[in-house]
Design a protein with these regions (language model features):
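Sec-dependent N-terminal signal peptides
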Residues: 6-12
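Positively charged n-region of N-terminal signal peptides that target proteins for export
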Residues: 1-5
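Intrinsically disordered terminal and processing segments
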Residues: 8, 17-112, 119-221
């Protein structure tokens, strides 16, 4: 009896850390050196920052992020302790931009949505690092990603991640789904992008775009 108890206890000690390990799923560049050089031609270096909502502001910050997103965080990809990886990119001593990615639930599996931003939070590039989808070819097409260029969080505040609709002027309206059957993954990409931009605004830009959330709220009244 005692032997069974000891075996059970040891197994619990082994399994528990594994559960904790997989409870928070981060999103890193597959090859930072190569990817940063490709996304920022002429850059000379980068700094990697790891930030989590529970460390930065805890439950209060999570609530604020969810309000800005217009949806609740859920699943392994959106726990309060997810370690977000933010890349600050430099040319010499000058900072020239940021790269940040998030995990997002797709129809057939996880999606990794990355945005490349200038210092003002304007999207300079968009791409999927991981995309498990029957329509991956169409969604990975360069023309699809180009539709995000020039947009900011201000545009995405007018996009409702729950309904998939925009209200008021928004550059998100110009982003077209290349395949009607890919609607789930298309909307997942937009939700992931909005979440991405909100986290960068919270962690790096000092809530520069928070003022526009209030404007959108007033428009809906």
């Amino acid at each position: 009896m005692m032997r069974k108890f000891l075996i059970g206890f040891l197994l619990a000690c082994i399994v528990l850390p594994a559960d904790l390990l997989f409870a928070a799923v981060g999103c890193d560049l597959n090859d930072p050196d190569r990817d940063v050089a490709r996304l920022f031609p002429g850059s000379t270096g980068y700094k990697t920052n790891y930030v989590a909502i529970d460390q930065k502001g805890g439950p209060a910050l999570l609530t604020q992020v969810e309000e800005r997103l217009g949806d609740k965080f859920q699943g392994l990809f959106e726990t309060i302790d997810v370690p977000y990886t933010l890349y600050e990119v430099f040319k010499g001593k000058d900072k020239i931009g940021y790269i940040h990615g998030v995990n997002q639930k797709g129809q057939y599996g996880g999606i990794q949505v990355f945005v490349v931003l200038d210092l003002d939070g304007v999207i300079k590039n968009f791409y999927f690092q991981k995309l498990t989808s029957r329509y991956g070819k169409e969604l990975r097409d360069q023309k699809f990603g180009e539709q995000f260029i020039g947009l900011t969080l201000k545009d995405f505040y007018n996009y409702d991640v729950l309904t998939g609709k925009t209200s008021g002027p928004s550059g998100v309206e110009r982003i077209k789904n290349p395949v009607p059957e890919a609607e789930f993954d298309f909307r997942a990409a937009l939700r992931g992008t909005k979440k991405n931009l909100i986290l960068v605004d919270e962690f790096i830009l000092g809530n520069k775009y928070l003022q526009y959330q209030k404007t959108v709220g007033e428009q809906k009244k």
